[in-house]
């Protein structure tokens, strides 16, 4: 199986649940045709370089996956039919250097997702220092002068 990346832009006028449905649709096309998804990246809403079908912005997504070659034709066909996807680009990673870059990218996405899940929230109140620590640091500053 070969390594691929598909970037697609969804219309910005869609609601969040409709956008999620479009992403799930693309993921389903990949998995139904024998592909394995490594990572999905939501890049968010961004300004387009030029207007596409009267839109100046779009919601960007990138999916890293491995798949047999025949899947790409089916994926492209489905992306062209879907009117809510205004642009797409499929990239094939061929040589060892490109494949290692693909692995780093897809692995890096997984790591950043795990880090977001494991992040601790900041305390609501600031942590107070003891008055003694403040006095000691002031004494050190005055002694250095």
Curated annotation (Swiss-Prot):
The keyword RNA-binding appears for this protein: yes
Ranges of biased composition (kind: Basic and acidic residues): 113-132
Biased composition annotated in UniProt, kind: Acidic residues: 133-145
Alphabetized SUPFAM superfamilies for the sequence: Ribosomal protein S6
Residue stretches in coiled coil: none
Stored InterPro entries: Ribosomal_bS6, Ribosomal_bS6_sf, Ribosomal_S6_plastid/chlpt, Transl_elong_EF1B/ribsomal_bS6
Alphabetical list of NCBIfam families matching this protein: S6
Family indicated by similarity: Belongs to the bacterial ribosomal protein bS6 family.
Name by which UniProt lists this protein: Small ribosomal subunit protein bS6
Provenance organism: Campylobacter hominis (strain ATCC BAA-381 / DSM 21671 / CCUG 45161 / LMG 19568 / NCTC 13146 / CH001A)
Gene: rpsF
